[in-house]
Design a protein with these regions (language model features):
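Structural beta-alpha unit
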Residues: 1-5, 84-117, 156-159, 163-166
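Small/aliphatic-rich secondary-structure junction motif
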Residues: 6-59, 144-145, 153
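Short, well-ordered secondary-structure micro-motifs
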Residues: 28, 55-58, 105-106, 129-130, ...
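General small-molecule cofactor/ligand-binding pocket signal
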Residues: 44-46, 92-96, 150-152
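Acidic, proline/glycine-rich short linear motifs
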Residues: 47-73, 159-166
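N-terminal membrane-insertion helices
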Residues: 72-80
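Glycine-rich, Arg-bearing micro-motifs that act as flexible, cationic patches
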Residues: 116-143, 159-162
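Short beta-strand elements of ligand-binding domains
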Residues: 119-120, 148-154
Length: 166
């Protein structure tokens, strides 16, 4: 199910996974799916699009926005297949446009069932990635309704994550 808004279908908790085009995000989705099955939780996938910066080129901006939305939908389909393979259930899919930490915070505030945020950490020497770094340095970004953050190291194997998920 894809939407711009969260839906509350039942009273189970939800694990929020940020879906972006990097291997560590896929590992986070894998782990969240496994944990959801063990915890009787649901998974919600969030893809965040950066708004185009062509203010006076409205046609170009709309074309770019449509292409980005199509790419996000395709990415969410891939992530959804992974989550369903692990949890046995279709995840909820949400696409938002804006600044990543702001959109994450808004979605958490809007959907009281979201209980844990799953992020993948990069294996690059430059650090775990901008989103993980932002939230580690300023957890107040999620202060309106703080929730635990599970950071899945990109260097872990799926077998290691299977053992951890139970």
């Amino acid at each position: 199910m894809m939407s711009d808004e969260p839906s509350i279908e039942d009273d189970r908790i939800k694990f929020l996974v940020i879906a972006d085009d990097c291997p560590e995000a896929r590992l986070a989705a894998f782990f969240a799916g496994r944990r959801a099955k063990r915890s009787n939780a649901r998974v919600i996938l969030l893809s965040i699009l950066e708004p185009p910066e062509f203010g006076h080129w409205a046609t170009v901006a709309e074309t770019m926005r449509a292409e980005a939305h199509e790419k996000a939908q395709a990415l969410l389909r891939e992530f959804a297949a992974e989550v369903k393979a692990q949890s046995g259930e279709d995840p909820e899919e949400v696409i938002r446009e804006g600044i990543d930490v702001e959109e994450i915070r808004k979605l958490i505030d809007e959907d009281p069932a979201i209980s844990i945020l799953f992020l993948g950490a990069s294996t690059e020497t430059s650090g775990p990635g901008p989103l993980v770094s932002s939230l580690a340095q300023k957890p107040a970004y999620l202060a309106a309704r703080p929730i635990p953050v599970t950071v899945v190291p990109g260097s872990m194997s799926r077998d290691e994550l299977r053992r951890l998920a139970g």
